[in-house]
């Protein structure tokens, strides 16, 4: 099973991003696959980011942001997952001395995806997802699947 990270979707949403074309191409390459998992937590992050004027020069209005996210929820070939019983482990990790506070969302996302059987994870930040038990974590904008 394969999942993709928030950053790829945000790049695909932003026509001004240098990564836009490559991100769109990667996501479109997954459209007909039956082994894709989309996590609601990831889509929640997408919604927050594409509405944020600190991230996008022209943020999406609420209804357009929801419609953009709904497109990822509506692919009938893809599994949509919401949550998993991972929070005890997330809190254990978060309590570690050198745990960066912003990693808590990544930890929850990674552990949720692993709970649902995801083995391959595409992200532009592979180092942020190392150590969570994925078979492969890679940046599809710089290396092939």
What is each stretch, according to the model?
Residues 1, 107-145:
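Acidic, PIN/NYN-like endoribonuclease modules and their adjacent C-terminal/linker elements
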Residues 10, 24-27, 47, 69, ...:
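Conserved protein kinase catalytic domain
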């Amino acid at each position: 099973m394969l999942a993709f990270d928030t950053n790829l979707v945000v790049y695909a949403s932003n026509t001004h991003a240098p990564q836009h074309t490559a991100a769109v191409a990667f996501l479109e390459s997954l459209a007909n696959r039956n082994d894709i998992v989309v996590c609601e937590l990831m889509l929640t992050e997408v919604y927050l980011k594409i509405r944020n004027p600190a991230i996008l020069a022209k943020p999406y209005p609420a209804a357009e942001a929801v419609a953009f996210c709904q497109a990822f929820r509506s692919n009938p070939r893809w599994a949509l997952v919401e949550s998993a019983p991972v929070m005890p482990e997330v809190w254990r990790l978060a309590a570690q001395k050198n745990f960066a506070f912003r990693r808590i969302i990544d930890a929850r996302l990674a552990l949720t995806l692993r709970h649902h059987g995801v083995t391959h994870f595409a992200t532009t930040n592979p180092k942020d997802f190392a150590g969570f038990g994925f078979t492969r974590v890679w940046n599809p904008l710089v290396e092939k699947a």
